């Protein structure tokens, strides 16, 4: 009586994040690939925006691009495997988004990017919580 045609209970289907774990993981990975890709393109992203000032003080643009693409690659692998690799990939994705958010905030506290990527990082840590406790 409490099941839907797909075998889920009503409580499960009422939870908007019930089946969204893979979608969240995919979105975190895609955004990280996009960030790494933008930094790889010719031209200097760091020199065109003050928001990237803090990142430029830490490392060159190519280093950030390599780091973001490496994290995104591990994230993509985590989409297809289970176990510790999946959890490690989510830790990497969430932490990279969080680091990016903090750097944007330090470079331009009044910008909107820091809040946006901060929310994305929180979504990543929420996914990690779900993956760790199999919720």
For the regions a protein language model found, what residue spans apply to each?
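Canonical alpha-helical transmembrane segments
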Residues: 68-82
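Membrane-interfacial loop-to-transmembrane-helix junctions in polytopic alpha-helical membrane proteins
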Residues: 10-23, 52-56, 60-63, 78-88
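Alpha-helical transmembrane segments of multipass membrane proteins
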Residues: 36, 73-77, 101-102
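Hydrophobic transmembrane helix segments
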Residues: 21-66
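Membrane-water interface at the C-terminal end of transmembrane alpha helices
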Residues: 122-135
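Alpha-helical transmembrane segments of polytopic membrane proteins
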Residues: 59-68, 113-121
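Cytosolic juxtamembrane helix and N-cap/initiation of the first transmembrane helix
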Residues: 1-34
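Membrane-helix boundary connector in multi-pass membrane proteins
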Residues: 82-117, 132-135
């Amino acid at each position: 009586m409490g099941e839907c045609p797909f075998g889920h209970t009503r409580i499960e289907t009422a939870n908007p994040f019930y089946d969204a774990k893979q979608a969240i993981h995919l979105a975190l990975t895609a955004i990280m690939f996009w960030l790494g890709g933008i930094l790889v393109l010719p031209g200097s992203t760091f020199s065109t925006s003050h928001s990237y000032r803090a990142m430029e003080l830490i490392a060159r643009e190519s280093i950030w691009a390599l780091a973001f693409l490496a994290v995104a690659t591990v994230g993509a692998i985590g989409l297809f495997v289970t176990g510790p690799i999946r959890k490690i990939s989510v830790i990497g994705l969430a932490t990279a988004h969080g680091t990016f958010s903090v750097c944007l905030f330090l470079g331009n506290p009044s910008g909107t990017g820091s809040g946006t990527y901060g929310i994305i990082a929180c979504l990543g840590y929420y996914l990690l919580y779900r993956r760790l406790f199999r919720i």
